[in-house]
Amino acid sequence: QLLPIVGEKAMLAQTIDRLTGLVPVEDVFIITNTEQRDAVLEVCPELDPNKVIGEPIGRDTAAAAGLAAVLVRRVDPQAVFAMLPADAVIHDAAGLCKTLDSAFAAAEADPVLATIGINASLPATGYGYIQQGNTIGDYADKAVYQVKRFVEKPDLATAQSYLDAGDYFWNAGM
């Protein structure tokens, strides 16, 4: 996340750049492990040091999301926030921002936990899948759906059946 693996900037810096125009940099919180906190500030000096949080105990994504929710709520109890992994390779930043804008609008209308699905292009066994449920509505010109179910990393035959069904998406982890 702190190296320029894809492109000229560190992946974390690219993640922050993608949000330009949607989320002001002063509203960005980073949850990282304690050992990497200083390196994060070195790679992204525009960040508020008080909003770069070293996890007291490294756990999993759910624990980091919970910590982020508590910290954001302290600043603004009505805030809507997103969890974005720093290691995602995203070529369509504008498309991501449009999707996030729709998710934010849906969450503001009816407090929900939103997740992003990626159109599956092959039967991948290394990704979790999201099965699309009923339409909730249109928000910011995009349809938003309920999640019917989550499936963790299926075998190849099951992944192929999901691709054939047409209502399963790769779980973006966002």
Regions found by a protein language model. Name each.
Residues 4-85, 91-92, 101:
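Conserved N-terminal catalytic core of the sugar/cofactor nucleotidyltransferase
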Residues 1, 7, 73, 135, ...:
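Residue-level marker of positions within ordered structural domains that often coincide
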Residues 1, 14, 36, 78, ...:
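Residue-identity detector for glutamine
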Residues 93-174:
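Conserved core of the sugar-phosphate nucleotidyltransferase
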Residues 2, 52, 113-115:
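Conserved beta-strand scaffold positions in the cores of enzyme catalytic domains, especially
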